[in-house]
A protein has these predicted regions:
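Short functional hotspots at interaction and active-site rims
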Residues: 1-202
């Protein structure tokens, strides 16, 4: 049986870019994780139920419009923060970090696990003082619980769909994330890990 990954084994992003608390600071830690997903008109297909002998039909769009869903969760605090953006870059990342920061308790400091995407460690990235970013090892998306969220959202609410416009895509993303974030049991089952157990309030 594999043991859960320990955040202490992760590589920290360059400290000059991120102003975290000093060693003497006594704050509650909110272990969190974040990621981004592209949702667009070139949508994914998933399996569906059908009668024996039938061949279910799934629509497929040839358009190129897409949006990006920025998502973060803190299972131990029972929090989820998301933004839907038309582009994925450093500016969008800064907006999402601000959203995460606004949900961190006054007596807490968030440690956010994330992958090595270029906008996660660019020079223009400004992390709020109540957030420290920890980078996952390269090519290890399976270590990020948020990846499970994207798979669930696509397979249950976003796949096998045709979106007429960017506005439709963003509306669908908002609907899917809201259904996930307001389902306490789903947040617990998808995102809780040994280093970030589900809150007893969930």
């Amino acid at each position: 049986m594999q043991t859960a990954p320990d955040p202490k084994d992760y590589v920290a992003l360059p400290p000059p870019k991120y102003g975290g608390p000093t060693a003497e600071t006594s704050l509650t830690t909110e272990p969190s994780c974040k990621d981004e997903a592209r949702i667009g008109q070139k949508n994914s297909l998933t399996r569906v139920w059908g009668q024996t002998g039938s061949r279910p039909v799934a629509p497929k769009d040839l358009g190129f419009a897409s949006a990006y869903l920025f998502g973060a969760v803190c299972p131990s605090a029972g929090k989820a923060a998301a933004l839907i953006m038309p582009i994925c870059n450093t500016a969008a990342m800064n907006h999402h970090l601000s959203e995460i920061s606004s949900q961190v308790a006054a007596d807490a400091h968030a440690v956010v696990i994330l992958d090595g995407a270029s906008w996660h460690n660019s020079r223009g990235l400004v992390a709020p003082s109540n957030i420290t970013l920890l980078a996952l090892p390269p090519y290890s998306p399976e270590l990020n619980p948020v990846e499970r969220i994207w798979h669930y959202l696509r397979s249950h609410w976003l796949a096998n769909s045709v979106f007429r416009s960017l506005a439709d895509i963003m509306d669908a993303c908002e609907m899917a994330w809201s259904r996930f974030a307001t389902n306490d049991g789903l947040v617990r089952s998808l995102c809780a890990v040994a280093w970030a157990p589900a809150s007893s309030a969930l």
